[in-house]
């Protein structure tokens, strides 16, 4: 609950101006509620209008994206880039291609990205972008033409010292490659750091593909060790999603001794009591681009349920939501608790509703918020930029070790900040406070014209 008068006033004004952007308002309210103890100690923030500036993007770019489909018909989509905050570094955040993309969702993601990037300790500001284009069902040539058209407008607003996009939902190595090629063509320059998630032959980083999923498990493992004197060993894990984050969270959790029993897509989920056959899922999703229901057709004992929201009714020790925002509501959270779940760490962005988070906290569930637990992807993007700047490549083991260190550091920064805020063990409060303080200090130092 917001009790600080300054923060209440800021939020009420924001609510009036952004009434049609519920995801953005939800993300802002969570942060403002968490940072109240910090703001109370810094009355100078109000005088400088710090919070008002922090919740307003520095810049939002909206543009049309015309492209020609294989039938020769002109199609038009809408493109966006939300450049939210550059106090601690160039804007950094992914590009999402999905029919659900709108300005409100990208503002929510860009706002979250500010604090996530801050927690990594790397010099990266916050941003997000994308389009309502749906790459599913499109040919490679259609995707290429769209990406080239998208970058033909976006290129003038980005660069390795200005704004460095990356992939997200609907934007993988193929799309990043097409956009990088068009940027290079338009600028006549090879700026490796202008986008991350590149192929290994032209400036990409080893371990980038695995980073978000691996990082989620490194964060969870450190939280288990330090807060519960426990580990993944012997635990049953429920994972939602079957994209990049889910696949590599499944891989690392299994390596750490857990048994992952579910994966899902937008149509439903599969339950395999023997443990998910990850090699099959990788082939299904990364090569054949099939649906998860095919898993149950080829694996004895596995069952498919045509309702992805029911994945949270499966008994487990640890839940790792890796699909999309607000996928766990109050009822799903209650089902998790009832069925023995004691740990929820988020691989997707804001996958739990505020009501679900209340259920976790009131039942003693160890809760790792997305801005802390899924920061591995952007952390390794930052490491990719570092390699590009140094004109060299690190080994998989070097990158993985740095990722592990960053994720363990994020846990400890979040935990220590939760103690300082008087909410020991509440990693949501801790992550928000730790991420906020670094950005706030930088903004104050750079003057109010910033």
What are these regions (language model features)?
Residues 2-27, 223-224, 337-450:
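Adenosine-phosphate binding glycine-rich loop
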Residues 22-25, 43-48, 121, 158-167, ...:
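Flexible, glycine/charged-enriched surface loops at secondary-structure junctions
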Residues 44-73:
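Structured beta-strand/loop patches that form or line metal/cofactor-binding pockets in enzymes
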Residues 98, 117-233:
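Glycine/serine-rich phosphate-binding loop and adjoining beta1-alpha1 elements at the start
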Residues 162-166, 190-194, 239, 262-265, ...:
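General beta-strand structural signal in soluble alpha/beta enzymes
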Residues 199, 204-313:
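Glycine-rich phosphate/diphosphate-binding loop of Rossmann-like nucleotide-binding domains
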Residues 268-367, 372:
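Rossmann-like adenosine-cofactor binding region
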């Amino acid at each position: 609950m917001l009790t600080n008068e300054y923060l209440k006033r800021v939020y009420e004004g924001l609510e009036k101006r952004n009434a049609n952007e519920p995801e953005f308002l939800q993300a802002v309210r969570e942060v403002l509620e968490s940072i109240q103890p910090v703001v109370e100690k810094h009355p100078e923030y109000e005088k400088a209008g710090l919070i008002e500036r922090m919740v307003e993007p520095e810049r939002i770019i909206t543009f049309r994206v015309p492209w020609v489909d294989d039938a020769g018909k002109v199609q038009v989509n809408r493109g966006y880039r939300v450049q939210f905050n550059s106090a601690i570094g160039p804007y950094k955040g992914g590009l999402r291609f999905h029919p659900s993309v709108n300005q409100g969702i990208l503002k929510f993601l860009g706002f979250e990205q500010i604090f996530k990037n801050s927690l990594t300790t790397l010099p990266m500001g916050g941003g997000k972008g994308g389009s309502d284009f749906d790459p599913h069902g499109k040919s490679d040539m259609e995707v290429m033409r769209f990406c080239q058209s998208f970058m033909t407008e976006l290129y003038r607003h980005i660069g390795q010292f200005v704004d460095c996009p990356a992939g997200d939902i609907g934007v993988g190595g193929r799309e990043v490659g097409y956009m990088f090629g068009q940027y290079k063509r338009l600028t006549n320059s090879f700026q490796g750091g202008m986008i991350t998630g590149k192929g290994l032959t032209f400036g990409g980083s080893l371990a980038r593909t695995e980073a978000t999923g691996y990082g989620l498990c490194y964060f969870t493992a450190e939280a288990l060790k330090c807060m519960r004197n426990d580990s993944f060993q012997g635990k049953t894990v429920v994972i939602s999603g079957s994209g990049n984050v889910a696949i590599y969270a499944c891989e690392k959790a299994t390596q750490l001794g857990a048994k992952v029993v579910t994966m899902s897509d937008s149509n439903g989920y599969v339950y395999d009591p023997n443990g998910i056959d990850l090699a099959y899922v990788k082939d299904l999703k990364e090569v054949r681009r099939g649906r998860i229901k095919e898993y149950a057709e080829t694996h004895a004992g596995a069952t498919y349920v045509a309702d992805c929201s029911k994945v949270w009714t499966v008994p487990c020790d640890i839940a790792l939501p890796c699909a999309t925002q607000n996928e766990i509501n109050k009822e799903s959270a209650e089902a998790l608790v009832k069925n023995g779940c004691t740990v929820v760490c988020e691989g997707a962005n804001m996958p739990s509703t505020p009501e679900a988070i209340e259920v976790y906290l009131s039942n003693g569930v160890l809760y790792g918020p997305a801005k802390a637990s899924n920061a591995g992807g952007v952390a390794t993007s930052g490491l990719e930029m570092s390699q590009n700047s140094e004109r060299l490549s690190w080994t998989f083991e070097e990158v993985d070790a740095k990722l592990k260190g960053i994720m363990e550091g994020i846990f400890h920064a979040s935990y220590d900040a939760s103690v300082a805020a008087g909410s020991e063990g509440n990693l949501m409060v801790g992550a928000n406070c730790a991420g906020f303080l670094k950005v706030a200090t930088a903004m104050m130092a750079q003057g109010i014209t910033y």
